[in-house]
Amino acid sequence: MSELPQYKKDFLKSAIDGNILKFGSFLLKSGRTSPYFFNAGDFYRADLLNSISTAYALTIDSLPIQYDIIFGPAYKGIPLATAATIKLGQIRPRAKYAVGRVLVRDRKEAKDHGEGGNIVGAPLKGKRVLIVDDVISRCTAKREPSPRLEKEGGIVAGIVVALDRMEKLPAKDGDDSKPGPSALGELKKEYNLPIYAILTLDDIIEGIKGLVGEEDIKRTEEYREKYKATD
């Protein structure tokens, strides 16, 4: 595997140092016990927010897609998209981000007074929308924003998340020995959308060498081997 870009190394180290990326034994909603856990909601200090916003901005800056609006879905996506938009303006002050890209967010509960509705920010009609969120772990967790945006006339151009676990969805019959697709792969297929991540599980395993113990690395590699998706 090729060496990780410096911004990925920096992001990974800050996630470990800030206890956002933890190693141990964690029970997931899927019922699986994972040797690692990532919680983007723990990026609450200024230095950590700077780290994640920089990582999002540099990832977005490298994307081969065109977009007009950055969208942060409620709830975790809102601060992430906001921070990424600000950082994009800082790293490219005279480029397209400073003048042409704007931020939109939604509410989980529609407002029936004032401006009303679920969407807050710039008009979406005819605009290409880039969704910024935290983690794709199950298909159902990320399915809601696209229909909402399309209802407002937006065109979803892609999704950027902090982490792609590269993990197959739980089998309906409970037999996890069977090969299967990931949540990210199913979402790509259902909506025909490009989806990008700052880090993948492969990146984590490559990047944590020298940062965590050998036993944690071994357990994470074994978990990847057992649950890695086919897509």
Curated annotation (Swiss-Prot):
Orotate binds at F37, F38, S137, R165. GO terms for biological process: 'de novo' pyrimidine nucleobase biosynthetic process; 'de novo' UMP biosynthetic process; pyrimidine ribonucleoside biosynthetic process. Pathway: Pyrimidine metabolism; UMP biosynthesis via de novo pathway; UMP from orotate: step 1/2. PROSITE patterns: PUR_PYR_PR_TRANSFER (PS00103). Pfam families: Pribosyltran. Keywords: Glycosyltransferase, Pyrimidine biosynthesis, Transferase. GO terms for cellular component: cytoplasm. Its EC number is 2.4.2.10. The keyword Nucleotidyltransferase does not apply. 5-phospho-alpha-D-ribose 1-diphosphate binds at residues 29, 75-76, 107-108, 111, 113, 133-141. It comes from the Eukaryota. It catalyses: orotidine 5'-phosphate + diphosphate = orotate + 5-phospho-alpha-D-ribose 1-diphosphate. Catalyzes the transfer of a ribosyl phosphate group from 5-phosphoribose 1-diphosphate to orotate, leading to the formation of orotidine monophosphate (OMP). Homodimer. This is Orotate phosphoribosyltransferase. It comes from Podospora anserina. The lineage of its organism: Eukaryota, Fungi, Dikarya, Ascomycota, Pezizomycotina. The gene is URA5.
